């Protein structure tokens, strides 16, 4: 089966660099799956779970947002914040939700809808991960 290079980086660290058969991406305009020889594209990410499949099995990462750069032989994810889903703890959930609530309440009229959508996406994803 054909593979593509996958890289996931955040400001804190490089989380993954491996050959994969597909990457499921939580895009801001909807989820998408990138596979080898995918048409080139750049998209923004929403809070969600990014899943990769390859010879090592399936791995899942929580991302808060960022960008995905997909170009035929590779997919590079530049995440604002990312971690393996196994590392998401109750403390991290509370920290992220509190920050999102503060951002939502401080948003100007023009940014209120975007802040509310971000908060809803973040809360839904974190609830699914920790089973709240």
Curated annotation (Swiss-Prot):
> Is the Cell inner membrane keyword given for this protein?
yes
Compartment(s) where it occurs, according to its Swiss-Prot or TrEMBL record? Cell inner membrane
Q: Does the keyword Iron-sulfur apply?
A: no
Q: Where are the transmembrane segments?
A: none
Pfam families given in the database record: ATP-synt_DE_N (PF02823)
Q: What GO molecular function annotation could you give as one example from this UniProt entry?
A: proton-transporting ATP synthase activity, rotational mechanism
What CDD domains does this protein map onto? Answer: F1-ATPase_delta (cd12152)
Major subcellular location class: membrane
Quaternary organization: F-type ATPases have 2 components, CF(1) - the catalytic core - and CF(0) - the membrane proton channel. CF(1) has five subunits: alpha(3), beta(3), gamma(1), delta(1), epsilon(1). CF(0) has three main subunits: a, b and c.
Family label: Belongs to the ATPase epsilon chain family.
Explain the purpose of this protein: Produces ATP from ADP in the presence of a proton gradient across the membrane.
Q: What is this protein called?
A: ATP synthase epsilon chain
Question: Which organism is this entry from?
Answer: Jannaschia sp. (strain CCS1)
What would be the name of the gene that encodes this protein?
atpC
């Amino acid at each position: 089966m054909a593979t593509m290079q996958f890289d996931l980086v955040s400001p804190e660290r490089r989380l993954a660099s491996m050959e994969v058969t597909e990457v499921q991406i939580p895009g801001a305009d909807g989820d998408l799956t990138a596979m080898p020889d995918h048409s080139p594209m750049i998209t923004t990410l929403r809070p969600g779970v990014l899943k990769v499949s390859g010879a090592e099995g399936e791995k899942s990462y929580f991302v808060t947002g960022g960008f995905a750069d997909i170009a035929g032989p590779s997919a590079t994810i530049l995440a604002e914040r990312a971690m393996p889903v196994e590392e998401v703890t109750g403390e991290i959930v509370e920290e992220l939700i509190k920050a999102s609530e503060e951002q939502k309440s401080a948003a100007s009229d023009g940014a209120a809808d975007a802040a509310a959508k971000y908060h809803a996406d973040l809360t839904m994803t974190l609830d699914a991960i920790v089973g709240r």
